C-alpha cells in the first residue's frame, strides 16, 4: 500500500512540473541580486569597491534586459529593464571617467534600489502565459 501511495504521489508531482508557471525565477533572481548590491551602504566608501560594484550591477542589468527582451508578453518589464540598464551604465561610465562623488554614488544606487524594488514586486505577481 505504501508503495502504491508513493508511486501516485511521485506521478502527481512529476505532472505538476510540466505545467507552465507565470513566475520567472531566473529573471527574478537577477533583479534581486541587483537590489542587494544597490542596498549595501558600504559600496560607496571606496572608489575601487564602488567601481567594481557598479560594473557588476551593469552586467546583471544587461543580462536581465537581454533575457527579458527575448521573452514573449514582457514589454512592460523590458521597458523597466531598459531604464535600469541606463541608470547602471551611467554610474559605471562615470567611474570609468573618475568623476564620482560619494553623494552621487549613494544617490544613484538608491535610485537603482528603488527601481529594483518595483521590478521585484511586478515580476513576482505577473502572468506571462
Regions found by a protein language model. Give the residues of each.
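Post-signal peptide N-terminal segment of mature Sec-exported envelope proteins
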Residues: 22-46
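Membrane-proximal N-terminal soluble sensing/regulatory segments of transmembrane proteins
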Residues: 44-55, 59
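Long, low-complexity or tandemly repetitive, helically biased scaffold regions used
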Residues: 36-39, 89, 93, 129
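N-terminal Sec signal peptide cleavage junction
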Residues: 15-16
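Amphipathic alpha-helix face/heptad-repeat signature
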Residues: 23, 27-30, 53, 80, ...
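Sec-dependent signal peptide recognition
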Residues: 1-10
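C-terminal partner/receptor-binding element of secreted or periplasmic proteins
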Residues: 103-129
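Long, amphipathic, charge-rich alpha-helical segments that form helical bundles/coiled-coils
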Residues: 60-108
Amino acid at each position: 500500500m505504501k508503495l502504491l501511495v508513493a508511486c501516485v504521489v511521485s506521478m502527481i508531482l512529476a505532472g505538476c512540473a510540466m505545467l507552465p508557471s507565470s513566475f520567472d525565477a531566473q529573471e527574478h533572481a537577477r533583479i534581486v541580486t541587483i537590489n542587494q548590491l544597490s542596498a549595501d551602504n558600504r559600496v560607496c566608501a571606496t572608489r575601487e569597491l564602488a567601481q567594481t560594484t557598479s560594473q557588476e550591477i551593469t552586467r546583471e542589468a544587461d543580462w536581465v534586459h537581454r533575457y527579458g527582451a527575448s521573452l514573449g508578453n514582457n514589454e512592460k518589464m523590458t521597458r523597466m529593464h531598459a531604464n535600469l540598464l541606463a541608470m547602471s551604465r551611467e554610474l559605471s561610465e562615470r567611474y570609468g571617467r573618475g568623476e564620482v562623488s560619494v553623494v552621487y554614488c549613494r544617490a544613484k544606487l538608491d535610485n537603482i534600489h528603488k527601481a529594483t524594488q518595483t521590478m521585484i514586486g511586478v515580476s513576482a505577481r505577473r502572468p506571462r502565459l
